[in-house]
């Protein structure tokens, strides 16, 4: 079939297998060109491995550190007449290139919050790898079924304590709009923490430790975003921020248990704002990102997922002098938080109107990166060609 982008709101409901493969190849080429990372992990579990930062971590571990990787994700395969999800095609491409390089790659498709997927993962590690020495936690999900109680929690994106008026960019109509978000109830905050907080990360590490599949000295990290004051009301000081602060709490107990296990470590890693399927759903993010791209590209400091994660590995996860803040988090977002960058973004924020969107922001760059997520608008891909949407992932365990 010929596959074209079909965008509905902040999601593209189609994905292109050849485009997704080209996108993965581009990230692999970047890592290969940057060169091998010393003291890297050799057996890595990536939870949330199919898109965004999780995919970038899997690529960096494999092609930067020469690691065998086991990836966990929840994606839908394509079938005749219906494309699969971009994460499915990304993972199929990753497997293909890892295999060509002689690297072990196995994936598990299912709900990472469930006990069943944890069990299947532990079995796969025991059978193939023995143990893993690094666990990347990069799940982005709007809901979670609690594995012990069966209760379903939904996350909410709202401020806490007061309503927030904010400017946003309607990406469909391409207009600036003012909007108001009502504050979250306590139940909404608690539910968001249940979905996006640190409980599941801790459950994973506890299960892996108990099963004896974490190597002594193993490290784990979960990815987070902090941002600056422009986004704080909605993000860091809102319901999602409450979940991110829960990560900061939970990491302490995880760090203690790994430290006692042969001197291992657990850290929260703070990464910059990028276009992902998760970030495009946050009301003010498209405008913020369009402005941030404009300013950072002019300064020559613009980075996407792969550049961020490669530097996180090289400098902090594997380096001898990690970028660490006073709260013990690893930081890769310092170029975004450069006061000069933030001041320029803030100034432009107040000046943007419907008439000057394309002059004051890099909305064009934002739109291109958004389409890239789904395998579209990528140079060198023939979008008029007939492609088969049914792509198999070799070495896949279906949960």
Swiss-Prot record:
Pathway: Lipid metabolism; fatty acid biosynthesis. The gene is fabV. Keywords: Fatty acid biosynthesis, Fatty acid metabolism, Lipid biosynthesis, Lipid metabolism, NAD, Oxidoreductase. Substrate binds at residue 225. The active site is at residue 235. Belongs to the TER reductase family. Involved in the final reduction of the elongation cycle of fatty acid synthesis (FAS II). Catalyzes the reduction of a carbon-carbon double bond in an enoyl moiety that is covalently linked to an acyl carrier protein (ACP). Its EC number is 1.3.1.9. One of its GO terms (biological process) is fatty acid biosynthetic process. It catalyses: a 2,3-saturated acyl-[ACP] + NAD(+) = a (2E)-enoyl-[ACP] + NADH + H(+). NCBIfam families: EnoyACPredFabV, PRK13656.1. The record marks 75 as: Plays an important role in discriminating NADH against NADPH. This is Enoyl-[acyl-carrier-protein] reductase [NADH].
